[in-house]
Amino acid sequence: MAEKFDNLEDHLEKFVENIRQLGIIVSDFQPSSQAGLNQKLNFLVRGLQDIDKCRQQLHDITVPLEVFDYIDQGRNPQLYTKECLERALAKNEQVKGKIDTLKKFKSLLIQELSKVFPEDMAKYKAVRGEDHPPS
């Protein structure tokens, strides 16, 4: 899988470098540099074709649109992953707290119901296979 990305990365780096060189030629264009300009434009077209070939290998990869927003804002796209993980961790802690609270509530409820309805709770515990209330 990484090989696909490495291949795409190589093509993109070459493409960006070609655009940089093309910008230099265009910014100081001389009629004598027309041949070099044509050559760079041909390299540019071939680079786009190479990138398009990579697209076929990566058709099953999806990127969240928010990642592109990060890039457009000049932020590191890896921050998106970090922030997603932090949000997931916070949500997991919140859910764990709710689960712990419900377990405590169940334990207290069973204790109190055992005091008020000892026979019924004994039957309940027998059906559930519990000898004693969970802690």
UniProtKB/Swiss-Prot annotation:
Keywords: Activator, Nucleus, Transcription, Transcription regulation. One of its GO terms (biological process) is regulation of transcription by RNA polymerase II. Component of the Mediator complex. The keyword Ligase does not apply. Belongs to the Mediator complex subunit 10 family. PANTHER family: MEDIATOR OF RNA POLYMERASE II TRANSCRIPTION SUBUNIT 10. Its main location: nucleus. Component of the Mediator complex, a coactivator involved in the regulated transcription of nearly all RNA polymerase II-dependent genes. Mediator functions as a bridge to convey information from gene-specific regulatory proteins to the basal RNA polymerase II transcription machinery. Mediator is recruited to promoters by direct interactions with regulatory proteins and serves as a scaffold for the assembly of a functional preinitiation complex with RNA polymerase II and the general transcription factors. It is found in: Nucleus. The lineage of its organism: Eukaryota, Metazoa, Chordata, Craniata, Vertebrata. This is Mediator of RNA polymerase II transcription subunit 10. The keyword Transcription regulation applies. InterPro entries: Mediator_Med10. One of its GO terms (molecular function) is transcription coregulator activity. One of its GO terms (cellular component) is mediator complex. Pfam families: Med10. It comes from the Eukaryota.
